């Protein structure tokens, strides 16, 4: 089975890791766009080169998984910066219709984000004016939406009037014009699904909030989906960078003609009801959407489940991962009994269940205590998938994919490679090492979180040594045979936010 794959952007979470996760399965092959055609951060990809790649290679594939951000705009960040016209949108539509006409038996799965609205001043991933006006733009959209749907109090009314006076008109015009175009693209996809040109569309929302530009856009898209009665083929939910994982899992389950049964076990009593950082709804509501999007079905009894997703959540309040080292909220212990959770995982494994862990107790990284307990019980290497990166839904979507590919025949050594690589990056790097280096090393070298200059190789070497240190201190009963080694650690976009960390088996 071959799947053609066009990623959201060139970062490993989109262009490398989904394919690596799928590679554990020995019955499927992912044909990805060559790296040379992809862009670099704000520099757009070679859009027409990618379209040629699709036309040339789709003939040998059963499914085409395509990111609209890549195919139309040239990547995720270019989708927030573009000045495309109706003519560009028409060419995009003609291309998709032409592919379906020429290859009617191919299933096209699209992803298309609802554009985010960050609440802070930074132009790192946004237009240049976001460096000065980002927070104000967020508040402008929030108050504009709330005024239309609800009531502003006196303080909000005053702030709203002040923003209308102080925010440059050309900034608002540019921002709102781009958002309107992007919503037009979302609505085009609704029509293409209605006509069966596209089989399925995933519409993740990045950094959601109850009010604001993203909520306004979401409402327009929701309404059109409902009007055309397409909620089973176009799904809107929180997420972004996990969408490649999700659609690969959906394609594989669709190919098998299966909706695998999944039981979800939460680590905390209130875990399902917690609204995570950077998201707009309870964890359990996002879970329902991601399960359907990936092609699974939920069951209420673990005995009926082929897979068990062990969902590590906060007890009551979610913090950032680096807070666990010094300022962990007491409710992580008083509202959650982590040892009981680990013993339940051990029991699931003992009866032969296929188990994956979505570690969403903290935002932007994993929980050290969980991994230590799994290691102490000697069950860490039995886990099929461990994900704990960025947002709750990033971890959730990729966790489901990690389980989906462990159907039929799968390579257990590759599963272990991925497991260890995720522990290295999601736990050791994101939760611990990243902040240590940002606070203690970068300033003395004249560097910062967003820019590593010409010192990326030097910082990479330090990261590798620290990962190895935390491996020795943390994994006392797991991965102790020295079979696996770090293949590489690099910095996408030359910044500290994420790394590309790959692990290889020295004996293969």
Regions from the language model: what does each represent?
Residues 1-508:
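An N-terminal assembly and electron-transfer interface module characteristic of large anaerobic redox
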């Amino acid at each position: 089975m071959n799947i053609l794959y066009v990623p959201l952007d060139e970062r490993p979470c989109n262009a490398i890791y989904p394919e690596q996760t799928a590679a554990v399965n020995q019955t499927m092959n992912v044909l990805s766009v060559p790296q040379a055609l992809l862009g670099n951060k704000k520099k757009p990809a070679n859009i027409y080169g990618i379209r040629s790649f699709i036309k040339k290679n789709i003939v040998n594939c059963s499914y085409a998984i395509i990111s609209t951000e890549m195919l139309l705009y040239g990547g995720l960040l270019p989708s927030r910066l573009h000045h495309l016209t109706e003519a560009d949108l028409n060419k995009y539509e003609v291309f998709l219709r032409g592919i379906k006409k020429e290859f009617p038996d191919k299933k096209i799965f699209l992803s298309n984000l609802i554009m985010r609205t960050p609440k802070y001043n930074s132009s790192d991933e946004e237009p240049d004016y976001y460096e000065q006006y980002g927070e104000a733009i967020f508040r402008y959209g929030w108050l504009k939406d709330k005024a239309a749907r609800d009531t502003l109090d006196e303080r909000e009314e005053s702030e709203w009037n002040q923003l209308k006076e102080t925010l440059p008109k050309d900034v608002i015009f540019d921002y709102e014009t781009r958002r309107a175009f992007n919503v037009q693209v979302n609505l085009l996809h609704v029509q293409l699904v209605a006509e069966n040109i596209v089989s399925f569309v995933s519409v993740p929302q990045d950094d959601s909030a109850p009010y604001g530009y993203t909520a306004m856009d979401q409402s327009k898209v929701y309404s059109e989906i409902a009007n055309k009665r397409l909620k089973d083929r176009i799904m809107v939910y929180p997420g972004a960078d996990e969408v490649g994982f999700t659609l690969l899992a959906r394609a594989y389950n669709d190919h098998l003609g299966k909706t695998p049964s999944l039981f979800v076990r939460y680590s905390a009593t209130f875990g399902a009801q917690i609204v995570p950082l950077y998201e707009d709804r309870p964890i359990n509501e996002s879970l329902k959407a991601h399960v359907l999007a990936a092609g699974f079905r939920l069951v209420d009894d673990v005995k009926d489940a082929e897979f068990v997703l062990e969902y590590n959540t906060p007890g009551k309040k979610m913090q950032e991962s680096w807070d666990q080292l010094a300022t962990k909220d007491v409710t992580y212990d008083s509202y959650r009994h982590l040892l009981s959770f680990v013993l339940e995982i051990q029991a699931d494994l003992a009866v032969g269940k296929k188990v994956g862990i979505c570690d969403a107790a903290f935002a932007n990284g994993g929980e050290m205590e969980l991994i230590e307990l799994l290691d102490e019980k000697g069950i860490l290497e039995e886990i099929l998938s461990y994900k704990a990166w960025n947002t709750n839904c990033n971890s959730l979507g990729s966790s489901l994919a990690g389980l989906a590919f462990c159907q039929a025949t799968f390579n257990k050594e590759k599963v272990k490679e991925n497991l260890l690589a995720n522990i290295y990056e999601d736990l050791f790097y994101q939760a611990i090492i990243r902040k240590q280096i940002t606070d203690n090393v970068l300033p003395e070298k004249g560097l910062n979180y967003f820019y590593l200059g010409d010192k990326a190789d030097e910082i990479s070497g330090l990261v590798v040594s620290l990962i190895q240190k935390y491996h020795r201190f943390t994994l006392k009963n797991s991965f102790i045979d020295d079979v696996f080694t770090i293949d590489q650690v690099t910095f996408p976009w030359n910044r500290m936010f994420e790394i590309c960390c790959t692990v290889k088996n020295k004996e293969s």
